[in-house]
């Protein structure tokens, strides 16, 4: 995902700088787990469009289900916060949280790819 043109950043423990990655490997003996964060280019509208474009992943606030789940915190769980408060909480406008379930990996990857392609088609509105 990190190489996709519409992805700003992938947030996953072993993808961080060496110090953080080494700690993740030390403490997460069985692997990193199924939670992944991605920052989608294009801000809030692109994040919303990504979520709306998912066909396999469910758009829900809980995590840790057998099903793959996705949420856009800026417009759901954290929507009551100001832009400054969102950033202080580490929630960027295009941030999407994923909880990967037990579906076939190829199906999950295909759904994420098509949603990323769709999210890149956001038309920015001019502000006067």
Where are each of the predicted segments found?
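Conserved small-domain helix->loop->beta segment predominantly found in fold-type I
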Residues: 1-55, 61-67, 81-87, 114, ...
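Short amphipathic alpha-helical segments with coiled-coil-like heptad repeat character
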Residues: 58-60, 106-107
């Amino acid at each position: 995902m990190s190489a996709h043109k519409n992805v700003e950043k992938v947030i996953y423990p072993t993808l961080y700088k060496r110090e953080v990655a080494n700690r993740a490997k030390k403490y997460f003996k069985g692997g990193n787990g199924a939670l992944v964060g991605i920052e989608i280019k294009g801000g809030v509208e692109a994040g919303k469009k990504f979520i709306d474009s998912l066909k396999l992943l469910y758009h829900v606030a809980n995590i840790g289900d057998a099903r793959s789940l996705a949420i856009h915190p800026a417009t759901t769980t954290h929507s009551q916060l100001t832009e400054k408060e969102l950033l202080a909480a580490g929630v960027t406008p295009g941030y999407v949280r994923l909880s990967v379930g037990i579906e076939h990996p190829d199906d999950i990857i295909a759904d994420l790819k098509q949603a990323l392609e769709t999210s890149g088609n956001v038309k920015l509105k001019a502000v006067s």
